Amino acid sequence: MRRIPGEFWYTEGDGTTTRLISGILAGQTFSSHLTGDASIQKRPMGRIISPLRSMGASIESLRGNGCAPLRIEGRPLQGIHYDSPVASAQVKSCVLLAGLYANAVTSVTEPALSRNHTELMLRYFGGQVTAEGKTASVSPEPKLRGGKGEVPGDISSAAYFLAAALLVPGSEVLLKHVGVNPTRDGILRVIRSMAGDVRLLNKTVSGCEPAADLLIRYGSLHGTDIGGDLIPTLIDELPILAVLAAFADGTTTIRDAGELRVKESDRLSILVESLTAMGADVTGTEDGMIIRGGRSLHGAVIDSHLDHRIAMSFAVAALAADGETDILHADCVRISYPDFYRDLEQLLQ
């Protein structure tokens, strides 16, 4: 995040930063303005504006469309209970972080359990956080204390190398010290349901997060069903799982994934478009897709639409496809993994 002329804080294309920092800024004693790139200015911020206003915050979309740019006037906040209509760790974390500046306990209940990194982190640094079922609560007291934290490897970034190992014959890949938080390990469960060989070795706790080495080997895959409460645990990994499904035998159904339409791009539409361009048999649905796998895929020109997860997913697809694949705007991977292509090339040596 950086400052740009006109007193705006600029969050690039980072929806997590935009939503979480809004919760913190809402309880301060000063005013703030937030904006981001074209993708951020299309993503729905009404989902955080509503609960923050319920806490007494002054926050508005400057264009009146529920998206950034946002103006936030810091105010004293009230503790609330919020029933979130979406299972979103970004929404939950925004409200809980605002709750640190409220006058009473703040709690959030979700329709399905989303990733819980914020709750673990706050507790690790001395926060009074409770979690029961699909509800998380935070108290404004005691105040957080500083300390040393350790963060394991990101399973969302590891996912592309897990997939590459499954698709390239003869592969065996060991990824060390990867976070395996059970609210984030949906991709491992899906790979196993597809008969993929993935093993957890040297399990440990890194700071406040469970971690392990991941050993993955090439093997034949079959179709599976991905939906329900599993979706929040792998929402960012669905693009690479769709790629795996296209190479697997049988049919894979992805459902309950409408949230992909409001990410950096409409990922559902782009996945259907791109997989079809490579020769896959894919039918889009309102909240997912049906992938009839087992076809040989071929290279194609893939428009990433400036979406880092689309670019990385189809770089992996290209490894197992016949012919050459060109990815437009391939450098968009820098938003989350600047060294992705270097690391992928090293893996192939």
Where are the language model's segments positioned?
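Structural preference for solvent-exposed beta-strand-turn elements
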Residues: 1-349
